[in-house]
Amino acid sequence: MIFATLEHILTHISFSIISIVITIQLIDLLVYQIVGICDSSEKGIIATFFCITGLLITRWIYSRHFPLSDLYESLMFLSWSFSIIHMVPKAGNHKNDLSAITGPSAIFTQGFATSDLLTEMHQSAILVPALQSQWLMMHVSMMLLSYAALLCGALLSVAFLVITFRKNTDIAVKSNYLLIGTFSFGEIQYLNEKRSVLQNTSFPSFRNYHRYRLTQRLDHWSYRVISLGFIFSTIGILSGAVWANEAWGSYWNWDPKETWAFITWTIFAIYLHTRTNQSLQGVNSSIVASIGFLIIWICYFGVNLLGIGLHSYGSFTLTAN
């Protein structure tokens, strides 16, 4: 009873803190450069990390198994993973471009985990025989860490595409205006003078330079985070194959979860391959990563919604009240 109450308290504290963090980030976005507001956001994420860590440890103690046996526990672990990814750039004293991704992702996953849809899973249950293995921690934790990293990397690629295509759209609109517009002599003289000034300087406009630097950072972090997630995914799939052989006598069975895990792994393997080709980097590789974003959600929620296959334990059904 004490552990259940403590878990309930930690759940609401962590959700409240992450909600405040999102609010702070929105204020920082709308009201530029408020002194100390960014530091408060970082401290909030750290506090959330410790709250979720305490929650998972508490559930581990009173359930007597690693808390990764159902969708509720996996969502809480996924939220915990997002908070870790958020803190990685800060530890290296890098500009944290991940904060706009990790914060909302953490609040979304934790909000869904604590919703009424998963009420039946809030109470820990005895593990089914197939899950009573030491491979549970290794396999499931690696897969969830890979989901968190791949989702963050894919969202960074989506942001890269949005900024890039928006820039191209602005250029196209301006080009059409120049082609179809009629100019007076004064307007033509002004454009010629402006072009002359731009040709005589070696620096692009501040706005274009800032946008260029932002897209480069997004592309850079997307590649690094996806590479990390791909490593976790590979380890998770291999450890899962070993566990499957021990539990069911076969390394691979092509059930829905395994099939979509393989598709996810293949998509991001293609992404990493495009990164080795200079001509395919940037937009092309980001498109592949964006496709991977959809594939991950199908892989993660698909089996739980269908409730079929060898990985159907921990699934949930939508029932009317």
UniProtKB/Swiss-Prot annotation:
- Give the Gene Ontology MF terms in alphabetical order: heme binding
**NCBIfam families the record matches:** cytochr_II_ccsB
Per the UniProt record, the source organism is Drimys granadensis
Q: Name one GO cellular component term.
A: plasma membrane
Q: Which InterPro entries match?
A: Cyt_c_assembly, Cyt_c_biogenesis_CcsA, Cyt_c_biogenesis_CcsA/CcmC
Keywords of the record, alphabetical order, are:
Chloroplast, Cytochrome c-type biogenesis, Membrane, Plastid, Thylakoid, Transmembrane, Transmembrane helix
GO BP field: cytochrome complex assembly
Q: Pfam families from the xrefs?
A: Cytochrom_C_asm
This one is known as Cytochrome c biogenesis protein CcsA
